[in-house]
């Protein structure tokens, strides 16, 4: 019997968000493939995201999370477990607290300055 279903549901949603962030980051990042050749010993396959230093989270599961940073940290590579993945090792994390980035992207076509102001007002740096 679940005593506090709202707490249980919150934990489930946060676990799903963490998993989604982790999987999606790895889907988009490249990796190093070790090869044995006279010309090289390693090849980069895919995008090198190691120099990405800012991660922005948006969407209901992150906005409503009690700890959105924990989910967003899923984009970071673990140098021990994933030495060849081309993801950042550290980053600053922001939350689209008002869930308006999508609208600001559309607004940009009408007025760049207003769109930028909307985005800046919505982004909250996570500790």
Where are these regions (language model features)?
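Helical "lid/coupling" subdomains associated with nucleotide-phosphate turnover
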Residues: 3-127
